[in-house]
Amino acid sequence: MLEKSGECRKERKIIMAKVEMQKIVEKMNLKNLTPDVSLEDRAVGVPDTNRPALQLTGFFEHFDYKRVQIIGYVEYTFLKTVDEKEKERIYDTLLSYQIPCIVFCRDLQPEPMLLEKANERQVPVF
């Protein structure tokens, strides 16, 4: 990027040490809805989160899969409008990426199909 003077400046990168998933779970008081998925060797190395609303519609270009995936009311409500076959395709595609975990907010409960597929792919859900 150029400054007003015309000189190039270096982009600043935020460097974050990886944080163990178990520490995040304890600090945030998260309930593990996939207890068969081990958190032992799992860590988060990106300080941001992602709400995968576009991905749930099938758009995965520029997907920030390394981030913790947050399912809020908008994403949850959208999933309620989708038929079972399409939901299965959405979950399969979302979980095909190496996402660190999925967190459901506002006491929203994931569907059994998602929990089953997350267990198969070893992706923790909270």
PLM regions: where:
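Short acidic, glycine/proline-enriched helix-loop-strand junctions
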Residues: P112-F126
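Gly/Thr-rich phosphate-binding loop signature of adenosyl cofactor/nucleotide-binding cores
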Residues: I14-L95
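Short hydrophobic alpha-helical runs that function as membrane-insertion/retention elements
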Residues: P100-R106, V123-F126
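Short coil/turn connectors at secondary-structure junctions
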Residues: D64-R67, Q98-I99, E120-V123
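Short, Lys/Arg-enriched N-terminal segments with co-localized hydrophobic residues
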Residues: M1-I15
